[in-house]
């Protein structure tokens, strides 16, 4: 079997799918994207495709190493996202050829279900509370919320009080009927993170995500030493070498590699094993589409330390398409009591509606995150 063609499709709301075709008619799907940089990743996919055309798709490990090492310059969000989507598609092909789901090829299940959580957008307490109520009606009891709006490097007590007030009202509204993590989104400087984490402790969040940016990872153990709240990070780390530094430094309790950013299934399985050796749990980052989610689920079901799975159903970014709009076998992604079951169809287990993908890829919008500025007109972290 040989790879004959790679096609990419930029899609709403902010996704990109790729299709790898073979000379035997077996097709694999992947989801390579950096949100807001889809065209750049698309170019990288097709550059890497030069290494793949005519090659045997079953040699996943070798092809991964070729894509990673052969170009001399390596790593980073663009190249690792391109590799990630290609890697997903190669695993999809292998599973289809062998008539087995990817988790079966990786040694079989370590669990029968995995807890899912849902993003709730909005910064106003009333909007967040309404969003939680809506999602609870369809079975969710675990959520992730914005931990704050933009903060200055040293900000005032009013900004801190505003962030804490939102969380306080949510805990008051729902008590211990729900659990929620708080995403600082890298918006907070290390000095302000110390202040904000201390103020949020009484409301017992499940975790705090990206308390500071990954490039400030030396602060993770310092922040962890002052709080009992688990700290989480990983969406802006792109290989096991990025995660190695964080694991060695300590401070992070939950790793969040993104299966569409951090080298795909092949790399993230290694990252999961590294985390387990440090007694660190796994909660793959996934505010993306169905192929990315499917890839995450296969890792969840073979990784002992996986504890939570993010998914994008109803997420505030989904303008123009919802999580399962391009999926034929929607029922396989159904949740029971807030848990996903293993996908059982061969490969990744997601059947893509290709005709719909082609139609929606025509004139797909180029999503960009907003540009925020502080009161003094300097650029703020989004």
UniProtKB/Swiss-Prot annotation:
Presence of keyword Magnesium: yes
Biological source species:
Escherichia coli (strain K12)
Catalytic residues, chain numbering: 185 (proton donor), 285 (proton acceptor)
Instruction: Name the catalysed reactions.
Output: D-galactonate = 2-dehydro-3-deoxy-D-galactonate + H2O
Q: What family, per the record?
A: Belongs to the mandelate racemase/muconate lactonizing enzyme family. GalD subfamily.
Source organism lineage? Answer: Bacteria, Pseudomonadati, Pseudomonadota, Gammaproteobacteria, Enterobacterales
Instruction: State the protein's name.
Output: D-galactonate dehydratase
Gene Ontology BP, a term: D-galactonate catabolic process
- Listed pathway(s): Carbohydrate acid metabolism; D-galactonate degradation; D-glyceraldehyde 3-phosphate and pyruvate from D-galactonate: step 1/3
Site (described: Transition state stabilizer): 310
Cofactor binding mode, per the note? Binds 1 Mg(2+) ion per subunit.
Q: Miscellaneous notes for this chain?
A: Reaction proceeds via an anti dehydration.
Q: Which GO terms describe its molecular function?
A: galactonate dehydratase activity; hydro-lyase activity; magnesium ion binding
Positions contributing to Mg(2+) binding: 183, 209, 235
Q: Which cofactor does it need?
A: Mg(2+)
Identify the EC number(s).
Answer: 4.2.1.6
């Amino acid at each position: 079997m040989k790879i004959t063609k790679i096609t990419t499709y930029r899609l709403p709301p902010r996704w990109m799918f790729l299709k790898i075709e073979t000379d035997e008619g077996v097709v694999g799907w992947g989801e390579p994207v950096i949100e807001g940089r889809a065209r750049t990743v698309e170019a990288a996919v097709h550059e890497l495709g030069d290494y793949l055309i005519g090659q045997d798709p079953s040699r996943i490990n070798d092809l991964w190493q070729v894509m990673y090492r052969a170009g001399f310059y390596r790593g980073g969000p663009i190249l690792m996202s391109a590799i990630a989507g290609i890697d997903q598609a190669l695993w999809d092909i292998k599973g289809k050829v062998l008539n087995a789901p990817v988790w079966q090829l990786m040694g079989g299940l370590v669990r029968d279900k995995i807890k899912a959580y849902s993003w709730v957008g909005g910064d106003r307490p009333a909007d967040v509370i309404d969003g939680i109520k809506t999602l609870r009606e369809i079975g969710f009891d675990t959520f992730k919320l914005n931990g704050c709006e933009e903060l200055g490097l040293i900000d005032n007590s009013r900004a801190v009080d505003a962030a804490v007030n939102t969380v306080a009202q949510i805990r008051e509204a729902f008590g211990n009927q729900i659990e929620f993590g708080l995403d600082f989104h890298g918006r907070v400087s290390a000095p302000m993170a110390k202040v904000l984490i201390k103020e949020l402790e009484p409301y017992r969040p499940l975790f705090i995500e990206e308390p500071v940016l990954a490039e400030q990872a030396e602060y993770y153990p310092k922040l962890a030493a002052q709080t009992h709240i688990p700290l989480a990070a990983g969406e802006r780390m792109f290989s096991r070498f990025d995660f190695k530094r964080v694991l060695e430094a300590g401070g992070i309790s939950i790793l969040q590699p993104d299966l569409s950013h951090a080298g795909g299934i092949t790399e993230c399985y290694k990252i999961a094993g590294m985390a387990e050796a440090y007694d660190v749990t796994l909660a793959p980052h996934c505010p993306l589409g169905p192929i990315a989610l499917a890839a995450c689920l296969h890792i969840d079901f073979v990784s002992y330390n996986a504890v939570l799975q993010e998914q994008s159903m109803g997420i505030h970014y989904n303008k123009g398409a919802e999580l399962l709009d391009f999926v034929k076998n929607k029922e396989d992604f159904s949740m029971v009591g807030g848990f996903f079951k293993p996908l059982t169809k061969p490969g990744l287990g997601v059947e893509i509606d290709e005709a719909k993908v082609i139609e929606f890829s025509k004139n797909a919008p180029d999503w960009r995150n907003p540009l925020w500025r502080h009161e003094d007109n300097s650029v703020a972290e989004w």
